[in-house]
From Swiss-Prot:
It comes from Arabidopsis thaliana (Mouse-ear cress). The lineage of its organism: Eukaryota, Viridiplantae, Streptophyta, Embryophyta, Tracheophyta. The keyword Transferase does not apply. This is Metallothionein-like protein 4A. Induction: By abscisic acid (ABA) and jasmonic acid. Down-regulated by gibberellin. Pfam families: Metallothio_PEC. Expressed specifically in seeds. The gene is MT4A. Signal peptide: none annotated. GO terms for cellular component: cytoplasm; nucleus; plasma membrane.
Amino acid sequence: MADTGKGSSVAGCNDSCGCPSPCPGGNSCRCRMREASAGDQGHMVCPCGEHCGCNPCNCPKTQTQTSAKGCTCGEGCTCASCAT
């Protein structure tokens, strides 16, 4: 039986995290829950530290505004989470 690790939360791979779907496997294709300070709700982040759904790891960072408030994606990014 796999050890899930108490206190950690891992979401499945999806476009919002900049991961290929279906996932090829491995730690590079995971979202991780990061707890915010002062009891605030945690944020989902890619292994590279980017916020899921805003700057998918496989998309370059630019200031292109998307339909999601405050999110940016690189020009030419084809991730569904970057669609306007």
